[in-house]
């Protein structure tokens, strides 16, 4: 099947849900393709989503990290969605709330059959914290490909940036082809073409081709 190019600028807000159970209630079944964005509360997740879709206010940025508790879903087309998962790991969030978020994130990664890939965003100056590794391990254990995206790359000189990227690639080499590592700057746009290329590939898994073919045959 020839892959069509997905225009991520067409992303539009679909729904918000407090947890995975409610997500199942709101969405039309566990079908099509979802790409999830996860990261620590200060990883620049909202800024990255806005930069990738070229929409300033698609994902709301907050001056208070950890405030976004909802799972926010954005629609690309009838079959494809981007899912903005709650930020994790912020110190000022109560422990009970942290545990609830982590349980919800784990549940989503393990149970969502239409999940085609996970972008784990990390500040390039502070990569691979414990919860980042946990997210990556959960995804790979569920056989979901991961893009470890090192954000805010404009904060480092080119040599320091490449050094960090190589160190993270080495640290994640045990996961083989399941994990890719790239750097990205929402401010400068550096790394954007590569990220969009990976997302576009994830938008065309074989199971979606089979689903669409079955629909055509049924008609």
UniProtKB/Swiss-Prot annotation:
Q: What are its cofactors?
A: Mg(2+)
Q: Which organism is it from?
A: Shewanella oneidensis (strain ATCC 700550 / JCM 31522 / CIP 106686 / LMG 19005 / NCIMB 14063 / MR-1)
What protein is this chain from?
Probable GTP-binding protein EngB
Q: Is Chloroplast among the key words of this record?
A: no
- The EngB-type G domain is annotated at 31-205
Q: Which gene encodes it?
A: engB
Do you know which CDD domains this protein is assigned to?
YihA_EngB (cd01876)
Positions annotated to bind GTP: 39-46, 66-70, 84-87, 151-154, 184-186
Its family remark reads:
Belongs to the TRAFAC class TrmE-Era-EngA-EngB-Septin-like GTPase superfamily. EngB GTPase family.
Q: Per UniProt, which keywords does this protein have?
A: Cell cycle, Cell division, GTP-binding, Magnesium, Metal-binding, Nucleotide-binding, Septation
Tell me, in a sentence or two, what this protein's role is.
Necessary for normal cell division and for the maintenance of normal septation.
Pfam families in the record? MMR_HSR1
Per UniProt, Mg(2+) binds at 46, 68
User: Alphabetically, which GO biological process terms does the record hold?
Assistant: division septum assembly
InterPro entries in the record: G_ENGB_dom, GTP-bd, GTP-bd_ribosome_bio_YsxC, P-loop_NTPase
What GO cellular component entries does it have?
cytosol
Task: Recall the GO molecular function terms of this protein's record.
Answer: GTP binding; metal ion binding
Q: Which SUPFAM superfamilies match?
A: P-loop containing nucleoside triphosphate hydrolases
């Amino acid at each position: 099947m020839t892959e069509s190019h997905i225009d991520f600028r067409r992303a539009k807000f679909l729904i918000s849900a407090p947890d995975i159970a409610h997500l199942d209630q709101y969405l039309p079944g566990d079908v099509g393709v979802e790409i999830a964005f996860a990261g620590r509360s200060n990883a620049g997740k909202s800024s990255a989503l806005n930069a990738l879709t070229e929409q300033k206010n698609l994902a709301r940025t907050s001056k208070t990290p950890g405030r976004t508790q909802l799972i926010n879903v954005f629609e690309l087309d009838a079959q494809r969605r981007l899912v903005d998962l709650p930020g994790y790991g912020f110190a000022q969030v109560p422990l009970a709330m942290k545990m609830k978020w982590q349980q919800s994130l784990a549940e989503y990664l393990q149970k969502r059959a239409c999940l085609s890939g996970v972008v784990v965003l990390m500040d390039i100056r502070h990569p691979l914290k414990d919860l980042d590794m946990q997210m990556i391990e959960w995804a790979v254990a569920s056989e979901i490909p991961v893009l470890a995206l090192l954000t805010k790359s404009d904060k480092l000189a080119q040599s320091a940036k490449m050094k960090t990227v190589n160190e993270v690639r080495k640290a994640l080499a045990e996961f083989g082809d399941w994990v890719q590592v790239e750097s990205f700057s929402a401010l400068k746009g550096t790394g954007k073409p590569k990220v969009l290329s990976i997302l576009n590939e994830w938008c065309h898994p074989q199971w979606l081709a089979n689903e669409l073919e079955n629909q055509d045959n049924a008609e």
